[in-house]
């Protein structure tokens, strides 16, 4: 009997040792946007408990993800500290991909590199731009991840920030298309006001009238139908359903409004999304205030 109890206890210990890690608590904590250091600390403990392969990769990309937020919280004047945390986040993502390639690993690698580049300055970080797109190409084309609002947002910001040819591959129309799919794929459990704001600002700056929109969007539709690679195809997402399509935030067709009219509608829609939620992160509040300021400036 005593031997049986010892065997059962040994089996129980083994079962606990090999039990899969539960990310429910740490993911919920991350979404509050208020406990990033606690999330980081919990994940470093989980990393030591993780088994090799997929489980370890899932801890590592979460560490990479929270590094973006930790870096964003550092004063912008302290570039050295920001560089350090973004580089740490990039390394976690690289280790995650090495352990088990996932879309999240590639996404958060690019996000940390992107933040590093924004801190450094566009012209000082041009060399990192193409590798970022190549990583996102793996995520979107090879791994088939088409519903990541964050990935499309990274592409939108990248194409909007970079200079165009011959210096680099910046393209405002591609940026707007990527911005549209970023908005269309925002998960229901988050607000992402900054994503709506980014698209609105890009449209405001492009400033096409309704006639030009109708003409150019029809051309985009032809390219959309022709392209086969997802990352190339979605450069023309604005024309996916033609100039008579209705975007998420209005019952007015794309061809019946100007860029700036739509930009204002998008910001008002983002305000309504925020006001319809009971809980908000600090980032949500900050984005809401910035959107209100833009609307005051534009209207």
Give the predicted meaning of each segment.
Residues 30-46, 78-94, 125-135, 169-178, ...:
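Helix-turn-helix repeat elements of alpha-solenoid scaffolds
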Residues 7-15:
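Bacterial N-terminal signal peptides
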Residues 135-142, 150-155, 161-167, 171-194:
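A contiguous pocket-lining binding segment that forms or flanks enzyme active sites
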Residues 20-31, 53-76, 100-120, 145-163, ...:
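Amphipathic alpha-helical repeat scaffolds of TPR domains
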């Amino acid at each position: 009997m005593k031997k049986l109890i010892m065997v059962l206890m040994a089996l129980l210990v083994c079962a606990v040792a090999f039990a899969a890690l539960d990310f429910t608590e740490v993911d919920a904590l991350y979404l509050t946007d208020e406990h990033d250091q606690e999330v980081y600390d919990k994940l470093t403990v989980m990393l030591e408990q993780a088994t090799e392969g997929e489980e370890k990769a899932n801890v590592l990309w979460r560490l990479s993800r929270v590094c973006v937020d930790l870096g964003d919280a550092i004063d912008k004047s302290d570039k050295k500290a920001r560089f350090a945390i973004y580089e740490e986040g990039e390394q976690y993502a690289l280790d995650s991909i090495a352990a088990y390639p996932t879309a999240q690993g590639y996404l958060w690698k690019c996000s940390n590199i992107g933040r590093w580049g924004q801190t450094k300055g566009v012209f000082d970080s041009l060399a990192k731009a193409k590798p970022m797109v190549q990583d996102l190409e793996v995520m979107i084309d090879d791994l088939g991840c088409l519903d990541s609002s964050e990935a499309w947002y990274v592409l939108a910001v990248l194409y909007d920030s970079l200079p165009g040819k011959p210096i680099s591959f910046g393209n405002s129309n591609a940026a707007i298309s990527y911005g549209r799919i970023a908005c269309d794929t925002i998960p229901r459990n988050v607000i992402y006001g900054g994503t709506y704001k980014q698209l609105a600002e890009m449209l405001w700056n492009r400033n096409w009238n309704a006639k030009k929109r109708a003409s150019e969007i029809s051309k985009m539709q032809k390219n959309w139908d022709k392209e086969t690679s997802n990352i190339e195809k979605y450069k023309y997402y604005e024309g996916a359903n033609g100039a008579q399509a209705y975007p998420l935030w209005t019952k007015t067709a794309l061809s019946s409004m100007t860029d700036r009219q739509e930009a204002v509608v998008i910001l008002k829609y983002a305000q309504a999304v925020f006001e319809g939620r009971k809980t908000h992160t600090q980032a949500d509040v900050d984005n809401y205030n910035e959107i209100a300021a833009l609307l005051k400036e534009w209207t």
